Amino acid sequence: MKRGGRDSDQDSAEEGTAEKPKRPRTTQERSQPCDWGNLLQDIVLHVFKYLPLLDRAHASQVCRNWNQVFHMPDLWRCFEFELNQPATSYLKATHPELIKQIIKRHSNHLQYVSFKVDSSKESAEAACDILSQLVNCSLKTLGLISTARPSFMDLPKSHFISALTVVFVNSKSLSSLKIDDTPVDDPSLKVLVANNSDTLKLLKMSSCPHVSPAGILCVADQCHGLRELALNYHLLSDELLLALSSEKHVRLEHLRIDVVSENPGQTHFHTIQKSSWDAFIKHSPKVNLVMYFFLYEEEFDPFFRYEIPATHLYFGRSVSKDVLGRVGMTCPRLVELVVCANGLRPLDEELIRIAERCKNLSAIGLGECEVSCSAFVEFVKMCGGRLSQLSIMEEVLIPDQKYSLEQIHWEVSKHLGRVWFPDMMPTW
C-alpha cells in the first residue's frame, strides 16, 4: 500500500511538472498588425539604400521614424541631378522642390555629385545655379554631363567659371572631375590645383577649348596622384608627357586623347617626339593609351611615323590603307582596333601585318571596309582564341576561291574556339 501510494504521489508530481500546452492565439491577436515604425533605424537605413529615390520618398511617409531615416546623411552622399526642359527632352527631370530641399537640408552631406543636362541653355544655367549654392559641401567627385549637344558651352564663360570655382574652393578632397565640353579655363584649373592637388586622381576634360597646354601642364606638375587623364590632342605636348613621367608622379593608368578636326586643312597637328613617348611608357609601363581619331585622310601625316604605346585605337572617319599599314608597324601594344570606314580597297595585307606585330590584340571591329574571306580567316588563325571581341559586318567579307560566306563562320569558329557569326545589318 505504501509503495503504491508513493508511486501515485510520484506520478502526480510528474504530471504537475509536465509542460503545459501553448494556448492558441486568438483571431484578434493574429489579426493585430505589426508596428513597422518600431524597426531599428539601422535596418530601415539598410533597406532604403536599395530603393530608388521616389520609392524612398514614398516610404518616408509611413511614420516619423522612417522620415528621420530618409534624411540621414548616408542616403545623401551620392546624387545625380537631371536637368531637362520638357519641350526639348523626353527624359524625366529632378523636381525643383526636391532640388530646393537638397540644397537646404543636405548640401553639406553631398560627396559624389553629377549633373546630366539636355541640349538647352536653360538646363545648363540651372546646373550652374545649383553649383553656386554648394558652399557648405566638400565634394569627392563631380561630373558635368551633356546628354546631347554641349549646352554648357552656350553659357557666358564667366558665369560657368564662377559656379565651378565655388566647388573647387570648398572641396578640399576632390578626387574625380569630369568636365568635358565645358568653358573651363587655365585660371580655374589653377584654383582646382591650389585646393585639391593632393587628392585629384581622375580628370576628364576633352573638348575644353579655353584650356591651353600650359594650363594642363600646371595640373600635371602639381597633381602627382593623377592616375586617369582625358584631353584633346592640342593639349598634349612633350612637356606634359615628361611631367607625367617624373619621379614624383604616380604611374598613370589611363590616358585618353581625342584627335579631332572640324574643318579639313585648317587644323595643324603637331608631332610628339618619340623620346617623350619612351619616357612616358618607361614610367607607366601598364598604362592604357586610348586614342580616338576623327580626321580627314590628308591630316594623318604626323601620326604613326614611329612606335607609340597606343593600346586602343578608334577611327571614327574613313582611314586609308596606308595609315592602317603604319598602325601595324608602330603600335605593338595594341589591344583594340575599331575602324568605322576605309573605302573599297581590301585590307588584307594590313590585317595580316597587324596580326603579326600586335601580339596583344584581343578586340577588333570593322565597319564599312572590305576584307577577303581568305585573309580574314588567316588573320583569325594568327590571333587565335585571344580575340575575345570580333565584330565584323557580313558586308565587309568578300568571298573568294577558298571560302564562301556560308563556309567562313565554321572556319573562324574553329580558330576562335567558340561559335562565331558575322554581324548582320538590320533589314528594317
Curated annotation (Swiss-Prot):
The keyword Protein transport does not apply. The keyword Lipid biosynthesis does not apply. Disruption phenotype: Mice show defects in behavioral rhythms with an extremely long-period activity phenotype. The onset of active phase is abnormally delayed from the light-to-dark transition: in constant darkness (DD), mice show significantly longer rhythmic activities. Mice lacking both Fbxl3 and Fbxl21 show an attenuated phenotype in behavioral rhythm compared to Fbxl3-deficient mice; however, they exhibit unstable behavioral rhythms, sometimes eliciting arrhythmicity. Transmembrane segments: none annotated. GO terms for molecular function: ubiquitin-protein transferase activity. One of its GO terms (biological process) is SCF-dependent proteasomal ubiquitin-dependent protein catabolic process. Keywords: Biological rhythms, Cytoplasm, Leucine-rich repeat, Nucleus, Repeat, Ubl conjugation pathway. Pfam families: F-box-like. SMART domains: FBOX. InterPro entries: F-box-like_dom_sf, F-box_dom, LRR_dom_sf. Residues 1-33 are annotated as: Disordered. Residues 34-81 form the F-box domain. GO terms for cellular component: cytosol; nuclear body; nucleoplasm; nucleus; SCF ubiquitin ligase complex. Pathway: Protein modification; protein ubiquitination. Undergoes autophagy-mediated degradation in the liver in a time-dependent manner. Ubiquitously expressed but enriched in brain. Diffusely expressed in the suprachiasmatic nucleus, SCN. LRR repeats lie at residues 119-146, 181-207, 208-233, 234-259, 316-341, 343-368, 369-394. Gene3D superfamilies: 1.20.1280.50, Ribonuclease Inhibitor (3.80.10.10). It is found in: Nucleus; Cytoplasm. Part of the SCF (SKP1-CUL1-F-box) E3 ubiquitin-protein ligase complex SCF(FBXL3) composed of CUL1, SKP1, RBX1 and FBXL3. Interacts with HDAC3. Interacts with CRY1 and CRY2 (phosphorylated). Interacts with KDM8. Substrate-recognition component of the SCF(FBXL3) E3 ubiquitin ligase complex involved in circadian rhythm function. Plays a key role in the maintenance of both the speed and the robustness of the circadian clock oscillation. The SCF(FBXL3) complex mainly acts in the nucleus and mediates ubiquitination and subsequent degradation of CRY1 and CRY2. Activity of the SCF(FBXL3) complex is counteracted by the SCF(FBXL21) complex. This is F-box/LRR-repeat protein 3.
